[in-house]
Amino acid sequence: MKMTDIQIAKENLKGHSICLCKDGAYFTDDGRGISPMLRFIGEGRDLVGCSAADIIVGKAAAMLFVKAGIREVYGEVTSQAGYD
């Protein structure tokens, strides 16, 4: 059975702070906090439609995911503000 993008992102999160996946291709980062997302957005990466797995999803991270067009998010820890 083929893994979904969110399953691939979750599987490859181990040892990293964030993993983004789209159409089976994934990339990871080990930066702290929201710095990986800020860097990805600043680099002009096309994140629309990606699935994301992150260690901690708070309000700021959730807002960046929405701004970037992330399709779905898995957080090992998610704050109520991040969920809302």
What do these predicted regions represent?
Residues 2-76, 81-84:
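Conserved mixed alpha/beta catalytic, RNA-binding, or beta-rich assembly cores of soluble enzyme
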